Amino acid sequence: MSVTKETVQHVANLARLQFNEEETERFSGQISRIVDLMDALSKLPTEGVKPMSHAVDMAIPQRDDVVTNGNQRDTMLANAPDAEKGHFRVPKVIE
């Protein structure tokens, strides 16, 4: 498939880009080659090939879903440089 200079100019206009004649000619050829490559890839036989999201077939290790006591406010506040009434106290940043 050949991408015309007019198509490149139209897409450039939509993207609010400006190309001179030389750039338009160059991009027309480059985009045509990319479209041809995608066309060739779409013609490859893929029946029986499992879809994948990663180039390497690997399993992501997952930890067990264990319910724990999440109420550890006192433990967390013990690590804070300054705390007041059960909350972190930070320096004033807005006047």
From Swiss-Prot:
EC numbers for this chain: 6.3.5.-
Keyword list, A-Z: ATP-binding, Ligase, Nucleotide-binding, Protein biosynthesis
Superkingdom, taxonomy of origin: Bacteria
SUPFAM superfamilies linked to this entry: Glu-tRNAGln amidotransferase C subunit
Top-level enzyme category: ligase
NCBIfam families for this protein: gatC
Function: Allows the formation of correctly charged Asn-tRNA(Asn) or Gln-tRNA(Gln) through the transamidation of misacylated Asp-tRNA(Asn) or Glu-tRNA(Gln) in organisms which lack either or both of asparaginyl-tRNA or glutaminyl-tRNA synthetases. The reaction takes place in the presence of glutamine and ATP through an activated phospho-Asp-tRNA(Asn) or phospho-Glu-tRNA(Gln).
Protein name as it appears in the record: Aspartyl/glutamyl-tRNA(Asn/Gln) amidotransferase subunit C
UniProt organism field: Magnetococcus marinus (strain ATCC BAA-1437 / JCM 17883 / MC-1)
